[in-house]
């Protein structure tokens, strides 16, 4: 893994954009994208740039089951708001959270990824080392699947809804096998609350109890962290 330490998330987003821009200029056509606050600075750099995205395909990591695309808490909505409405892509794939057949939708999403191999995959990381909704204990060889959200995740998400009963109880999520098939991975993490997860991902054993640790086995991973998220790392990783 290559580790890049920046002063803050603004610089981190700019550094991530440099990587994506260079990969696109070198022929990358399919981007694996993520949601949440971590990639917002990256997406802002996309929007502010003169980069033409009209020939790019994006494939998102996940989506809540039961949320319509126009629900402000859905990842369809997030991606339109933070990127696609201002920087249109040729084609953008996000799992169908309103599907009547989740298993079939997961198989279809695996086929989409197979038909459009991901050139650069963007990731964040959870405090417990999860990537996307792949929580500790998720098999490393799994493809796109339905995830039953943990009570902690449901409670954490309840602040976005009127009450906890409205919070989605499951999500459709790319598996670690899909993520590992990407040619290049860029993982971003900011803040001291991510420091322990970053340390375990990079320096700890490869274990399904730390889903992100599988990235140690990927041939091309760049980790972009601010100083706070890097504080637990061995000095050799700090530039």
Curated annotation (Swiss-Prot):
Pathway, per Swiss-Prot/TrEMBL? Amino-sugar metabolism; N-acetylneuraminate degradation; D-fructose 6-phosphate from N-acetylneuraminate: step 5/5
Disulfide connectivity for this sequence is none
InterPro entries annotated for this entry? Glc/Gal-6P_isomerase (IPR006148), Glucosamine6P_isomerase (IPR004547), Glucosamine6P_isomerase_CS (IPR018321), NagB/RpiA_transferase-like (IPR037171)
This enzyme's EC code(s)? 3.5.99.6
Catalysed reaction(s) here are: alpha-D-glucosamine 6-phosphate + H2O = beta-D-fructose 6-phosphate + NH4(+)
| Any one of the GO BP annotations | glucosamine catabolic process
Q: Which domain of life is it from?
A: Bacteria
One GO CC annotation, please?
Answer: cytoplasm
Catalytic residues in the record: 62, 128, 130, 135
Q: Which UniProt keywords apply?
A: Carbohydrate metabolism, Hydrolase
An annotated Gene Ontology molecular function: identical protein binding
Q: Its function?
A: Catalyzes the reversible isomerization-deamination of glucosamine 6-phosphate (GlcN6P) to form fructose 6-phosphate (Fru6P) and ammonium ion.
Q: What family name appears in the similarity comment?
A: Belongs to the glucosamine/galactosamine-6-phosphate isomerase family. NagB subfamily.
What is the designated name of this protein?
Answer: Glucosamine-6-phosphate deaminase
Taxon lineage: Bacteria, Bacillati, Bacillota, Bacilli, Lactobacillales
């Amino acid at each position: 893994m290559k580790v890049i330490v920046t002063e803050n998330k603004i610089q981190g987003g700019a550094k991530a954009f440099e990587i994506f821009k260079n990969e696109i200029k070198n022929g990358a056509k399919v981007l694996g994208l993520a949601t949440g606050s971590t990639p917002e600075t990256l997406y802002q750099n996309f929007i502010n740039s003169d980069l033409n995205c009209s020939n790019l395909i994006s494939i998102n990591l996940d989506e809540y089951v039961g949320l319509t695309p126009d629900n402000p808490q859905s990842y369809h909505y997030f991606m339109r708001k933070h990127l696609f409405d201002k920087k249109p892509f040729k084609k953008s794939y996000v799992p169908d959270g309103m599907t009547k057949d989740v298993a079939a939708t997961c198989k279809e999403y695996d086929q989409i990824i197979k038909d459009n191999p991901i050139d650069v995959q963007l990731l964040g990381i959870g405090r417990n080392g999860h990537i996307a909704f792949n929580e500790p204990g998720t098999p490393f060889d799994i493809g796109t699947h339905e995830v039953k959200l943990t009570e902690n995740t449901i409670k954490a998400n309840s602040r976005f809804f009127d009450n906890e009963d409205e919070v989605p109880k499951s999500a459709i999520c790319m598996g670690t096998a899909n993520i590992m098939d990407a040619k290049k991975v860029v993982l971003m993490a900011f803040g001291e609350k991510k420091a322990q997860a970053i340390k375990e991902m990079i320096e700890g054993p490869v274990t399904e109890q730390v889903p992100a640790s599988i990235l140690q086995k990927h041939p091309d991973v760049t980790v972009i962290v601010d100083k706070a998220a890097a504080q637990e790392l061995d000095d050799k990783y700090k530039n």
